[in-house]
Each structure stands twice: as structure tokens, then as C-alpha cells.
Amino acid sequence: MSDICWICNDVCDERNNFCGCNEEYKVVHIKCMQLWINYSKKKECNLCKTKYNIKKTYVSFKKWNWCFNDKKTTLFKIFFILFALVFIFLTITLSNDMANLVTGINDLICSIIFLIVYTVVMLTSICFSVFVVAIVVDFLLEAKEKNSFLTIREIV
């Protein structure tokens, strides 16, 4: 009688040593185990709790798949980045004019008000810059994770 792969329930003549289990749990196709590991993202056997010998491999950046499941979040991030970049550009463009305006005013109260407004605009621009960097880094880390796969090897 032939052995049966515990993942696909097909006939299997392979006996692989991916964990500490014995007998029927060693009967598994290598391709089935690869698919199961990449799907489940489990790092250890559910039964014997032995850690799998797994290597994470990343796809080359040029070959990344940029399709994301959560399109609303991705769209929100893109629109936020565009809005922030436009705001930052306008702040930089207008900052020189605002500085000249503040220094040209003789009234102390108006000068202080303009200085406060100018400072708030600049701080907002800096905050937007930090948020843009954080969102881009998060976006790239998520893409990197989605463009990776796990390779399992037998335990020696």
C-alpha cells in the first residue's frame, strides 16, 4: 500500500525530515510543504513543535508585484502623500515671501501674529514631511513582505 501525503492526500513516495514527527507525518511532497509553509507562515510543526529549517527569500525589487489587497488604504496613503508634498512645496515657495512680509511690518503685534502663523505653517510642513517618510517606509516594508517567499529544508 502506498503512503499518502498529509497535505494533499495524494499518493506520495517521499519521506522528508522537516520536523521531529515520525511515520505518516514524514510522508509529504516537497512542493506541498513549500506551499503550506508559504500559506500558513508557520515557523514550527503544530504537533511536535520542532522549528522548521526555513529560509526567507525576497524577490528582486525590479520584479516586485505591486498589487495590494487593501486598495482603500493604499489609495488613502497615495492621496495623503500627494497632498503633503503639495503643502510642503507651497510652504517652501511662500516661506521667503512670508519672511519678507514679517520683516517689513513696523507694528509689533502684527509682526508677532505673522511670525506665529509662519511658525505654525513651517511646523505643519515638517510634520507632513515626517508622516510622508513614515508612510513611504511602511508602504515599502509591506511590499517587501508581500514579495517574499519561504523555502523549507530538511532537518539534518
From Swiss-Prot:
Its main location: host cell. PROSITE patterns: ZF_RING_CH. It catalyses: S-ubiquitinyl-[E2 ubiquitin-conjugating enzyme]-L-cysteine + [acceptor protein]-L-lysine = [E2 ubiquitin-conjugating enzyme]-L-cysteine + N(6)-ubiquitinyl-[acceptor protein]-L-lysine. A zinc finger (RING-CH-type) spans 1-55. Residues 1-73, 133-156 are cytoplasmic. It is an enzyme of class 2 (transferase). GO terms for cellular component: host cell endosome; host cell Golgi apparatus; host cell membrane; membrane. The keyword Iron does not apply. This is E3 ubiquitin-protein ligase LAP. It comes from Yaba-like disease virus (YLDV).
